Design a protein with these regions (language model features):
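Extended amphipathic alpha-helical interaction segments
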Residues: 160-289
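Hydrophobic membrane-insertion alpha-helices, especially the h-region
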Residues: 22-36
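N-terminal Lys/Arg-rich, disordered targeting/topogenic segments
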Residues: 1-16
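Hydrophobic single-pass membrane-insertion segments
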Residues: 36-48
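Long, amphipathic, charge-rich alpha-helical segments that form helical bundles/coiled-coils
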Residues: 136-174, 284-309
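A cross-kingdom feature marking solvent-exposed beta-strand/loop segments within repeated
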Residues: 91-101, 147-154, 238-248, 301-319
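N-terminal Sec/ER secretory leader and immediately downstream segment
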Residues: 50-159
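A cross-kingdom marker for long, charged
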Residues: 48-53, 57, 249-252, 258-341
Length: 341
């Protein structure tokens, strides 16, 4: 019961509540800032051979043809959803909701995971077009193609986890010498199928990154075929310029895509070693990997700079586009060498 001789000052109570609210907001902001720095950590590269050997030792697997590629896919997919902060693309609460660099990095990784998972299902695991597809890969592939920003019922992470589990089941059977129905065929035509996808992905990324500076481009959509037509008319000259708000999105998507691709190419070097050696293409592949590794260098500015081509400030997008374009040229040469060499 309040003592009437000492009435409570309403303004004092109000100030006390405001003080508590102020400290709560300060704590909330500081916590989110700390979490943002934690979530924004660079995901480490890993040695595909060591990871494959470690998994083989842990689970008693035999390192057979295709083992390293499959393990590398599993490792990259695991890092996608279990890195510091987990999978952020579908988060609706702070601080993840205010961060777009990591979700774009995740999307870049995801595209490469999807492409490789589909090629393993349709090409690497099948001897010819009339052969049966693997039952576990039939589950894994569509799981990885589930929409990347679904929050609940079901969550995106749960679908990708099911894809990882199905791919792991395929790996278990692949490494078992008594399981003849799980196969991985390291053939030239299979590798060419995947390289065709890779060169399209890298070409698209290079175009988006190069558009950070406004340019006039000639429309080459129908070049090389005098009888070619297209559904919708486009002018012969185009002005292309990436929105300022999309500059860092494209950059981090490319960084994520190349992160995954570096590891996949290193795994391909192991599993397709005989094919590459026969075509004298190992050095070409290693040079492509070296070009892509340059895309993972540390960024020493707090934001992605977008200076003009020969201006005072750097243009991170053009630098990234340069590395990717050189790697893509190498991919095209490698594919042609495998097809015709």
């Amino acid at each position: 019961m309040t003592d009437k001789r000492y009435p409570v000052n309403k303004s004092t109570k109000k100030r006390s509540k405001l003080k508590i609210l102020k400290w709560f907001l300060i704590l909330f902001v500081l916590t989110n800032i700390i979490l943002m720095f934690y979530y924004d950590q660079k995901v480490d590269m890993f040695d595909v051979k060591k990871v494959a050997a470690k998994r083989a030792d842990m689970h008693g697997h035999n390192i057979v043809t295709g083992f390293t590629t499959t393990v590398t896919l599993l490792e990259v997919a695991d890092k996608l959803i279990n890195k510091p902060g987990g999978y952020l693309t579908n988060d609706k609460l702070p601080p993840s909701a205010f961060m777009d660099n990591i979700p774009n990095w995740e999307y870049g990784v995801l595209v490469q995971v999807r492409d490789l998972a589909r090629v393993i299902r349709n090409d690497f695991s099948r001897s010819q077009s009339q052969s049966l597809e693997d039952e576990d890969l039939k589950i894994a592939d569509p799981r990885f193609h589930y929409e990347n920003n679904h929050w609940i019922f079901p969550r995106t992470e749960s679908q990708y986890s099911e894809g990882i589990e199905a791919m792991h089941n395929y790996l278990e059977r692949l490494s078992d010498n008594n399981q003849e129905d799980a196969q991985f065929y390291a053939r030239t035509d299979n590798l060419v199928s995947w390289l065709n996808l890779v060169e399209k992905r890298l070409g698209g990324l290079s175009q988006k990154l190069s558009a950070s500076v406004e340019k006039e481009r000639l429309n080459t959509d129908l070049s090389g075929d005098t009888a070619a037509t297209q559904s919708t008319y486009k002018p012969s000259e185009l002005k292309v310029k990436t929105s300022w708000f999309k500059i860092d999105d494209n950059f981090y998507e490319a960084r994520g895509s190349t992160y995954a691709l570096i590891h996949f190419l290193k795994a391909i070097e192991v599993d397709f070693a005989q094919v590459l050696e026969k075509k004298n293409a190992l050095i070409s592949l290693r040079q492509i990997i070296r070009e892509l590794e340059a895309t993972q260098e540390s960024i020493w500015t707090p934001m992605i700079l977008n200076g003009s081509g020969f201006g005072l400030f750097a243009n991170h997008s053009l630098v990234m586009a340069s590395y990717i374009s050189r790697a893509n040229a190498g991919i095209i040469d490698l594919r042609q060498l495998l097809e015709n060499g």
